[in-house]
């Protein structure tokens, strides 16, 4: 595979968080903003157009994992939401906080109403296919961690 053929948010957003969690200079903060913008421009979907049956095929807002895997993944949502929250904490950027909150709130929208599990992918499925949905432990951990972080930041339980 040639370089840049399969971009992913899984490096840019976490690296922005890494920079912002140190003692970033103003130049490093701007570099982090650029990394977050890259993640948003390439992978964040704030809305989805309905299909021919007037159904939106994915729960939005969400974050796709990579170019070759055009599926919204909870861990990717958490990567970008964490970067937004880190930017908010470093700069007070209220738009970054609002974007993080929108992404994190959607985790509770896709959550299974019976058992509380958050699926690894946010694609809408028919009931039979939905029974075979996967729940990756690393993704579940990321979802729980970001929900707890948001609860702490907002004072909500």
Located regions from the model:
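Glycan-recognition and catalytic cores of secretory/periplasmic carbohydrate-active enzymes
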Residues: 1-157
